[in-house]
Amino acid sequence: MSIGLTFTGRIEGPAALAEAAKILAEQRGCSLSVNRTGLRLELCPLGGQLNMLWRPGEAPEDPWLVRGECVSTPAGAGLHRAAVELLDGLPIRRLAVEDETGFFRHRNFQRMKEEHFYTWLRTLVEVCARESGKGVSGMQLCWDLGQYAPEDIPDTVVTPMGRFRLSELADMVERDGIEALAGRFFLWNGRTQDARFYRNRAINALWEHCCFAPSSRSQEDEAVNAAILDDLERAAKLDPSLPLPRASYEEVCALAGREPVLADGPALEEEFSPGYRKGPVTHALGALRLTLPGGYLYRWEQWDSGGAHLWTDGGSDSPIWRVNAYHAREGEAQFTDSLNALHGVEGRELRGGALRWGWREIQEDGEPLYQAVCEVIAGPALYLLTATCTGPEGLGQIAQTIGGISVVTNTARRETVQTQKE
């Protein structure tokens, strides 16, 4: 269930369209990426993209054909308006737009919000209200299933804009009206990128991306921390009366080594303080579910032949995790004999699979290290995990993490995806 638009049209060629998009991107302050088959304009987080693909006409003399789309939820009505206005400025002939909100035709922003985006939001509120008080765990709204899953807290819902009690959304609508909730739930609910837009963009980054680690740890931490502070400071200048997450602002200032500059003003008061990555988060690789501290950074480690998924927090004393996935050519995956030479080998059954693990001492750059090796089988899939630490005391933490490993069957994954769509 989403709101968006699709379009088709004709263009002189990719170069002319890309050049026009570049000019618009510079004017509107959005980013542009172009490849040989199309382009993407990034207007805001939460899927705030205008995507388009092109192909030549049937005959050499025919114009090129272009098609594209923008999905406007959960980002908000401001994104929808911005996407329509970008289409207005692009050299696309015979432009045909399928806009379920009707905004491309009538251009009444308030009408679009009330008839479509607020109706969409009320539906989500009703879903949460029905589940309230049942002790529901793992409920997510508008969450990207391709990334980590935050820690479960019963009777709450995870969203890109923060964690809420299931009853809280309905209470807010009853107390303050749908407009108030929309201004907090949608990242871009206004006509323009106003103070609330910058505040909400910072709130999204605090909840979803910030590791609450020093900026000196990595370029990723430096960029995220700086963006949060810049957005909150800009929001305060545009509207000094707007409530802001001031405690989080001061916390990130300390991490970034920046002096707080916000003048006194109202604080955004909420039950849950920002930061999914302050707690444990669960990563999905196929059927495997691996729960690690949220502060760990992920990257793909390239090897001469292949590579591995790698998680580390940059600290010398914390385990470094690597994961590889393999698939049996026929039948079910089986454990290998590689673990037989390890110390303390043990195993356990999982719902939908099984695992075995042990540990060994290794040398790396002349330094003694301890490494746990774990194999997980789930149907035809075999997952090989290693966790390397500097001392034997780190094996206890690794054992706890391995104790939390689970696998998800295809049936369960289908049910999860269906729940997210509903």
Predicted regions and their residues:
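Short, flexible beta-strand-to-coil junctions
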Residues: E12, T37, G314-S316, Y326-E330, ...
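Signature of long, low-cysteine stretches enriched in small and polar/charged residues
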Residues: A284, F335-G391, E415-E422
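Short secondary-structure junctions
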Residues: K22-N35, V97, G294-Q302, N340-L355
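Short, conserved charged micro-motifs
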Residues: I11-E19, E330-D337, L395-G396
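Mixed-charge, glycine-accented linear interaction segment located at domain edges/termini
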Residues: T388-T419
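Acidic (Asp/Glu-rich) sequence patches and key acidic residues
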Residues: M1-K278, H283, D304-W311, G315-R322
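Secretory pathway targeting signatures of secreted, lumenal, and periplasmic proteins
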Residues: A284-D337
